[in-house]
Each structure stands twice: as structure tokens, then as C-alpha cells.
Amino acid sequence: MPSIYQLKPAFQNLLRPFVRGLFRMGVTANMVTVLAMLISVALAFFIYFHFQNQTTSLIILIYPLWMLIRMAFNAVDGMLAREFHQQSNLGAYLNELCDVISDTALYLCFITFAFIQTELLLLICFLALLSEYAGVMAPLIGSDRRYDGPMGKSDRAFWFSLLAVIIYIYPFISNNNQMISYITNGLILFIGLLLILTIYNRIKNSVNTHI
């Protein structure tokens, strides 16, 4: 299935000179991984508390900007690990765990908006965790780590960024709170349905590859 993840090689080529510079400065893959997680969690808390007491503002657009920067962080830590011989068992743990922590925080912060259904957002977090676990499980049966779409990590970053943009621009279009609820929860439901398909694809392709 198509996924934004397939654009990763081209993205890495753009970042390669920057990665070489980081290596010369003594920056390690694990440093980048942990820093990205800390910024993600800090931003999630900031959005959650900031928008509890006021309506949407331009500040919400920090979210899609960070999601793009975070994709660069994820590419950089992987390139440092692979191309500069920094791969380690600790790095493998940090890569998976920090991503899951960051994803969960960055999705849950949308609970602060009253028009978003909490139960639906919690379900998305669960399905996102399950999809990553389905990918991580593949090596246990002799297959490669699976990154199949259509709702991988990069895809979720895009759709949640779109959610943030919708939340920002909607008040300029309409003041119908019921409609914004339908739009945002409909988008979240769409993400959930594609997450279920992603889980299925990762399990199916892991088993088929192993056979």
C-alpha cells in the first residue's frame, strides 16, 4: 500500500550533508532520538494546557511544523546509526520506545479540544501502538521490521498535522461547533480505519515474507 514512508530515501539524501556535519560535531544517534522525544512531549503538554483556556490560535500551527522537523530528526538518527556505525542494542530500544512515547503524547494532546471525542482519540492511540507492535514483531518470525502503510508513522504525522490546520482555519470559515466536531472526528475515524488496514498489511506481509 502507498505510504509517505516511501519518500524517505529522497528525504535522507537531502539531509546527508547535515548529518555529516552533526557527526563531526560529536552528535550521536541516541542523542537525536532522545531530544526528539523530549521536544515532542514538551510540545504536547504545551498544546494541551495552552488550549484549555482559549480558542484556537496561530500557535497550533507549531504542531505541523514540528511534525515535519520530527521526520527530519527520525531520518537523521537512523542515518547516524547506519552510516556512522552507531547502531547498538540500546539504540534499537530507544528508537522504538521514544517514537511510541512521542506519538502517543502528540496524539493525546488533541483531547484538550472539546469538539474532539476523547474515546475515539484514545482508540487511535491504541491502534497506532498496535500497528507499531505489529511491525516490531516481524523480526521475531524471521522477517524484516515492517513499515507497511497506508497509515504508518509518517502518514499519521501528515493527517494529524492536517487536523491541526483544520482546527486553526475553521473559525475563519464558520462558527458552527457541531460541524467542526463532525469534520475533526470524521478525520480521526478515517485515520483509525486505515490503521486497522495497516495492522492487517504488516501481519500479512510479515508472514508471507517469512514463508
Question: Language-model segments: which ranges?
Answer:
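Glycine-rich active-site/cofactor-binding loop and its immediate structural neighborhood
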Residues: 57-92
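Active-site His/Glu-centered metal-binding helix of metallohydrolases
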Residues: 72-80, 93, 97-101, 130-133, ...
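Hydrophobic alpha-helical transmembrane segments
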Residues: 1-65, 105-144, 148-211
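Basic, amphipathic juxtamembrane/active-site segments
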Residues: 79-119
